[in-house]
Amino acid sequence: MRVLVTGHNGYIGTVLTPLLQAAGHEVVGLDSDLFEQSTFNTEVPAIPSIRKDIRDVQLEDFEGVDAVMHLAGLSNDPLGDLNPELTYDINHAASVRLATLAKAAGISRFIFSSSCSTYGASGDDMLDENASFNPVTPYGKSKVMVEQDVAPLADDNFSPTSLRNATAYGVSPRLRFDLVLNNLVAWALTTGQIYMKSDGTPWRPIVHIEDISRAFLAALEAPRELVHNQAFNVGRTTENYRISELAEIVHEVVPNSRIEYADDAGPDKRCYRVDCSLITEVLPNFQPQWDARRGAQELYAAYQQVDLRVEDFEGPRYKRIDHIKHLISSGRLDTSLRWREQAISVGV
């Protein structure tokens, strides 16, 4: 298939696109490249691409495309809190418009990168795909709104699928340090402290970005009737941890590290555990391969290789919200998160 991947130059996209190509699919990317300066230790995969904001996508951008994988958007809760109205404009309105255009273009598969943040504040209960939504951030709410507005577009010719990713971790050419396991390992290596900004009690499901990418591939290649207008939790049911448990794993992986709690550490209102059994039952080709300990070991080795420093991961290069603020303050982005110079299309 010829697959259009929005957000292909982001944290997940730069891992997903080579996987798709290795499986024999033709890939074209679409990305505004807000994080083009955030490359970590390796080159971003070179694929034909369109440099464009998802708010500006037109029908002709889908020419020759068989399937869409939609990853683009403001990528996490702190970014969503930066400007909630803008979050809904980009993450919700532009996503629904993208799906509507894809359907009009005759595309049969639309795979949406949703999130377990849709469950929000849910306590200790184990949640499957039928659980009630309870998002607590604009980011989580925007994901719910997209799922609810794209589902009615489904018909005999258009099959949307929502993949509700657990909290991601792992090494990527566009690495993020604002994710819990990535962040804890970075603190442990650079300072000897596993720095806890919450009290460690909330539950969080986690999943490696390679396993997220495998889920996208499995959904793409599955018989249509298995994924038509369906939602799947993406991860492993065994990979639900309290944040304090993740800190203990990092402590065991990173020598001479110790766990420290911030003076103002309190409970994080985001707390949820998810049941991920459905996706492996329905899509047997999806076989997740990572767990938290192996992921922490991978991150530790990658950080050692580049001699990571605190100023690297706490500064604007890799911290998504600070990077956006830096681009705005330097005049490169306007307050609507559009490049001040005209976007260009390349390579297609």
Task: Label the model's feature ranges.
Residues M1-A67:
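N-terminal Rossmann/SDR dinucleotide-binding element
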Residues T6, L30, V68-L71, F110-C116, ...:
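SDR active-site strand-loop-helix element
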Residues T39-F40, P78-E85, A121-D125, P173-R174:
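Conserved catalytic-core motifs of eukaryotic protein kinase domains, centered on the activation segment
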Residues I54-I90:
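NAD(P)H-binding glycine-rich loop region in Rossmannoid oxidoreductase-like domains
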Residues V96-P138:
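Conserved Rossmann-fold NAD(P)-dependent oxidoreductase catalytic core, especially the SDR/UDP-sugar
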Residues S142:
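Active-site helix of classical SDR
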Residues Q148-R204, I209-L220, E248-V253:
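NAD(P)-dependent short-chain dehydrogenase/reductase
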Residues G192, K197-V348:
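C-terminal substrate-binding subdomain of Rossmann-fold SDR/epimerase-dehydratase oxidoreductases
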